[in-house]
Amino acid sequence: MVQKSLLFSLLASTALGALTKRYSFPLPESQGSETFSEPYEVAAGETFDGGMKTYGRGVECTGQVEGGEDDTVFIVQEGGTLKNAIIGTDQIEGVYCLGSCTIENVWWEKVCEDALSLKEGDGIYTISGGGAQGAEDKVIQHNTGGEVIIDGFEVYDFGKLYRSCGTCGDIQRKVSVSNVVAVSGSQLVGINENFGDTATIDSSVCATDVNDICATYNGTDGDEEPEEVSTGPSDYCIYTEPIAECA
């Protein structure tokens, strides 16, 4: 029995090693670094171009302990754009959007609690290019209303790429996913069918070693945790199986 357990462990570690060797997270080369003593605010309608520097807060990640606005690296106000930046490992909360925002070519070296939290507004939130790795749970957390567009994002070693808040009450949300590369994750998308959420996943998406492409839940108003209802294509999870493996 011990020998059999050791064999299974060896096979699992060998498979993981082979996957890691084959798929390497394409984090861009940093052009320098800056450490903020407080969140950097991108004003409404303004653009912050990070010049591909690495930005952090000089603190240790606290894992899945819920942080707050004061713990973020960037806060993006309504209509703001954050582009060409790397979020370093020395942070608790990555980026908050307090209204419709554009996140363009932003990379997370290692996600702490969440990478990107959409906190306020009900417009369009666009995530274009960029990527994230090492998320124990969620990469993109959608708390408010509106529509999220995720295009050209790369996500490795993650819990969920996108999750519409399951404990924020009856708010309808939409998400569309295209040209995404997903490797080694639990769930690409999670939405609340009882709130009328929909997820549209384009055939340009590839996924390797991802357990579920899309799952639906019954969301709550915060008094209890949401329960998973189903996985796979449905009236709420709109896509065609099979999703291609990443080349």
UniProtKB/Swiss-Prot annotation:
Residues 1-17 form the signal peptide. One of its GO terms (molecular function) is pectate lyase activity. Disulfide bonds: none annotated. Binds 1 Ca(2+) ion per subunit. Glycans are attached at residue 218. SUPFAM superfamilies: Pectin lyase-like (SSF51126). Pfam families: Pectate_lyase. Keywords: Calcium, Carbohydrate metabolism, Cell wall biogenesis/degradation, Glycoprotein, Lyase, Polysaccharide degradation, Secreted, Signal. Its cofactor is Ca(2+). It comes from the Eukaryota. GO terms for biological process: cell wall organization; pectin catabolic process. One of its GO terms (cellular component) is extracellular region. Its EC number is 4.2.2.2. Belongs to the polysaccharide lyase 3 family. Pectinolytic enzyme consist of four classes of enzymes: pectin lyase, polygalacturonase, pectin methylesterase and rhamnogalacturonase. Among pectinolytic enzymes, pectin lyase is the most important in depolymerization of pectin, since it cleaves internal glycosidic bonds of highly methylated pectins. Favors pectate, the anion, over pectin, the methyl ester. This is Probable pectate lyase G. It comes from Aspergillus terreus (strain NIH 2624 / FGSC A1156). The lineage of its organism: Eukaryota, Fungi, Dikarya, Ascomycota, Pezizomycotina.
